[in-house]
Regions:
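Flexible loop/turn segments at secondary-structure boundaries
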Residues: 4-5, 102-104, 186, 276-280, ...
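Structural beta-strand/beta-sheet cores of well-ordered domains, especially the beta-sheet scaffolds
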Residues: 175, 181, 213, 266-271, ...
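Metal-dependent nuclease catalytic regions and adjoining charged, substrate-binding loops involved
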Residues: 14-69, 76-180, 187, 317-347, ...
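N-terminal accessory regions of nucleic-acid-interacting proteins
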Residues: 200-267
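Conserved RNase H-like, two-metal-ion catalytic cores of nucleic-acid enzymes
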Residues: 9-26, 256-343
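Short acidic loop-to-beta-strand element that houses the catalytic metal-binding Asp/Glu
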Residues: 1-3, 272
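Conserved catalytic-core segments centered on acid/base and nucleophilic motifs
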Residues: 75-79, 217, 228, 234, ...
């Protein structure tokens, strides 16, 4: 990961000195180390409380912010206990080493063509977050976790023991618990299309009825889409979805489709990028995890149904990905699109994910 998870304005780890007041980042940078902004928390009582609340997010192992600090806290437990057992009482500092989202590669390479990541404008490729205070605060929790796991090993719960689900189950993530289907055998047999968490736009909360999120739906016994009372649905789209499910029908809004189709002008450029989010930047001005474009495909539909499979289909591929071919890629894009006299595109570009393709074009 990168430091932006903890330091970017969009990350949400900011606190204020009063309601609607000045916002301060939870971490401030000193050299190449990000440290907790304890000084700003002393400005007002409100700031102190707000600071502790934001810091508490780092102490939630299931939050987006607490996962890595929790891992580091367990490492601290193991390291310190091993050192003490060996009679070594030297203090150890604990930092989270992450890639620097502000580092832009300058393109330097050695004699063998390998990237050389020099310090650029005071920015290092790897930066550090000081987690000494956070990992120390985690130690009491780590001890409880160890005791809990030891109790599970000593006396496992029967398979059908009633348990609750929560964010610790990590459904749909790469850390998803492998045992959740054993805890909820009935849920295992619910078809995916009939799951209660399949309402459009990930609608899984019904706050007026005391249910917040997909886990609470399951814990309250609402496992299937039609378990949720129809009267709870307030969105028109959800009502349509439920009606289609209950009656086995389809809903097709031809008027909306026709309105959208009428805006399309020929030729249509069916366009798609392929990218590689490389952790280490490979080419000049790239940053860590930048979506590095290595291929595009273009299919030009000249008129309704008119697209010659030879003349109107183009693919640009940086097959080896070792050389920087972004300039050639951009020129190939320009060469295959038609433009009006004022520089605007002649026709319509269609992409599966418009915001993604637009973002890559802006970066190029």
């Amino acid at each position: 990961t990168t430091n932006s998870k903890y330091t970017d304005a969009k990350a949400g780890l900011f606190f204020s000195d009063k309601r609607g007041g000045t916002k301060y980042p939870l971490f401030v940078k000193e050299g190449n180390i990000w440290r907790l902004n304890a000084l700003a928390s002393t400005k007002t009582d409100y700031a102190a409380k707000n600071y502790e609340a934001k810091k508490g997010l780092l102490l939630d192992r299931y939050s987006n912010y607490g996962k890595y600090p929790h891992d580091l806290a367990f490492q601290r437990y193991v390291i310190e206990h091993a050192l003490r057992k060996a009679g070594d009482n030297r203090p150890v500092n604990f930092y989270l080493a992450v890639l620097n989202s502000e580092y832009a590669f300058d393109g330097t390479r050695d004699a063998n063509g390998n990237c050389v990541y020099n310090q650029i404008g005071g920015q290092e490729l790897v930066t550090f977050l000081d987690m000494n205070e956070i990992t120390l605060a985690y130690q009491t929790f780590i001890l409880k976790e160890i005791a809990m796991l030891e109790s599970y090993i000593a006396k496992p719960n029967p398979v059908n023991t009633k348990v609750t689900v929560g964010n610790w189950c990590a459904w749909g993530k790469n850390t998803e618990c492998v045992f959740w289907k054993h805890c909820f055998q009935k849920l295992r047999d619910v078809p995916d299309y009939n799951s209660a968490n399949k309402y459009l736009n990930s609608h899984q909360s019904f706050k007026d009825y005391g249910i917040v999120g997909k886990y609470e739906l399951v814990n309250q016994g609402y496992w299937q889409l039609d378990d949720v009372p129809s009267g709870w649905l307030t969105s028109e789209n959800h009502k349509i979805q439920r009606d289609c499910f209950d009656n086995g029908t389809e809903h097709i809004d031809k008027e909306k489709m026709r309105f959208w189709l009428d805006k399309i002008e020929y030729p249509i450029y069916h366009f798609d990028f392929e990218t590689f989010p490389c952790p280490l930047p490979r080419f000049k001005r790239e940053t860590p995890y930048r979506q590095s474009v290595f291929e595009f495909s273009l299919h030009i539909e000249r008129a309704p149904g008119v697209c010659d499979k030879q003349k109107d289909n183009f693919i640009f591929l940086n097959a080896e990905c070792a050389d920087d071919e972004r300039e050639a890629l951009v020129k190939a894009i320009v060469d295959h699109f038609e433009f009006n006299a004022d520089g605007t595109l002649h026709g319509t570009m269609l992409a599966q994910n418009t915001s993604f393709e637009r973002g890559r074009l802006n970066e190029l």
